[in-house]
Amino acid sequence: MSEADKSKLTPWTRRKVLGAAAASTAAVALGAGLAAPARAQGKKLTYWGGLIFSDDANKLLVDTINDWGAKNGVATEVVMINQNETTQKVSAAVASNSMPDALDVGLGLGLLLGRQGVFTTLDDLYKKIGDAQGGWYPGTDKASDTTAAAGGRIGIPFGVNGNLLLRRKDLLEPKGFKDAPKTWAELAEQAAAVNAPPVYGLGLALSNVGDGNVQINVMQAYGGRIADDEGKKVTIKSEETRAYLQWLKDAWDKGVFPPGNTTWDGAGDNQAYLAGQAAFIANTGSVGIAAKKDDPDLFESSAFSALPGGPKGVVSPIDVQLRVIPKASPMQDEAKALIEYLSNPDFMNAYFNVAIYGPVLKAQEKLKAFDGSNSILVGLLGLAQNGTAPAYPDVYNAAYADMSSNFIIPKMAQRVVIDGWDFDKAMDEAQAQAQNIYDKYK
């Protein structure tokens, strides 16, 4: 489930975090212990932060930025933006020339606006931070490289997220499955072994939501592709995609998917797992955080691991979160100093402990947050170390993003499992629909 979906969750997701006051105290302590460049008096820096699932993390970011400003003579205003509304608000701000001085964006929006020349390139700052902290993880480095589109790197990564495989150890281990499945075939086998409605083995969404696009990753792990290496000609119809559809149909026929999973909204898999009705789901760490607070027994019975692989290897996309500076900002130096400050290990350790992100810098894996005591962060560390760039092995471009937002692959899956179409007919439709989208970007 994406961060953008989380504001739609049922009430169990909106409970206040008891440690908010502690987070505020931590921010003050961090600011006192870290030096930052002095800045000119009388200016105001506006920062738009991305509102995430964790109230602790949101408050820590606000307090830390304001504390940095107070210590450096820079008036600050931090506005936390619901990520469902980020694109709308940023687009309006660009049109009205009212952008903040710095902000958080996801990779997709950053790439789109970077292509339009909205953001300052930050190659020197990217190198400085990387050199100071052991270098950037390869997946982060590749995913965040906007040079081809924007003439340079337009953002400084601060966290990665993506889907992990969540599993019920209490159901699987009595059946002899102590380790996470390494392949999608093994996943289907384990899911079938513990399938006992109303507890279903495989809580994967096959609906027209972001979670449904996990099926793209499964297809790619079987060797299927959306398009060619140039990112222009759609290549969905293939023997490799046929192999993926066979895997899907076989699992469906075993009855391992929960009823209604082809029409779930963005919270469907979350709710199934938290209600004890799914042995496996693919999701971000938000489900684990909810279970830890609201159902500690379920949390202790859960494990988090990387997505399985297929005949062509593991496809486990990371989504990189960026801090960017609009070119229109009159506070370029101050914004750069703030972003550098926010990359310091003390702040990031505190932030990782309460946020739902994995590390981006190699030195961060040595932070206390990733010492193994938090099973969610263990999974996110593995994602950071081994995750693949968005769309890999396909080309991540505007056409691919458009195809994803139209849920072409989940719709193909629905044709097979709900409408009973044969594989060729389903692939032909998906191929034609996707090519129509790609043709718009020629």
Segments the model singles out, each with a brief description of its role:
Residues 63-137, 170-182, 271-272, 276-280, ...:
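Extracytoplasmic "Venus flytrap"/periplasmic binding protein-like
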Residues 123-139, 206, 224-243, 292-300, ...:
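Short, solvent-exposed loop/beta-turn-alpha elements that line the ligand-binding surface or hinge
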Residues 1-12, 23-30:
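N-terminal secretory signal peptides
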Residues 191-195, 231-261:
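Glycine-centered hinge/linker elements that transmit conformational signals in sensory
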Residues 107-162, 214-217, 303, 371-374, ...:
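Hinge/lid segment of periplasmic solute-binding proteins
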